[in-house]
């Protein structure tokens, strides 16, 4: 079963296999890496910075998104943020929010 619309559907999905037995990525970065490997050139997200006439949208592929997320991770690491640290931020609804 791939999707669900009711509580019964959810129960059916959960009955298929225990979550720990599924081949699920263990982190968001692992998810992005797996998706980049499978669909690197496909669109991951599109955004439009301005809403003026003639403003064009920008689209990031899964490879682009993975690259930007890696850049952000490298920045945090260079600032001394480690694996067990927590980073919180407040940002507007922009593409930078998605890649940070």
Model-derived regions: residue spans:
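Acyl-group handling in specialized metabolite and lipid biosynthesis
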Residues: 16-24, 52-58
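A short N-terminal helical cap/helix-turn-helix that marks the beginning
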Residues: 2-5, 22-48, 67
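Conserved AMP-binding/adenylate-forming core of the ANL superfamily
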Residues: 41-100
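Short, structured coil/loop segments at alpha-helix boundaries
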Residues: 6-7, 94
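Short, contiguous pre-domain boundary segments
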Residues: 8-18
């Amino acid at each position: 079963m791939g999707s669900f619309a009711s509580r019964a559907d959810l129960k059916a999905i959960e009955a298929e296999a225990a979550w720990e037995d599924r081949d699920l990525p263990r982190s968001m970065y692992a998810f992005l890496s797996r998706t980049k490997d499978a669909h690197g050139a496909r669109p991951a997200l599109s955004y439009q910075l301005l809403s003026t006439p003639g403003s064009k949208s920008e689209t990031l592929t899964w490879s682009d998104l993975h690259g930007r997320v890696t850049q952000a991770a490298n920045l945090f690491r260079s600032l001394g943020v480690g694996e067990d640290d927590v980073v919180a931020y407040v940002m507007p609804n922009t593409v930078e929010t998605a890649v940070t």
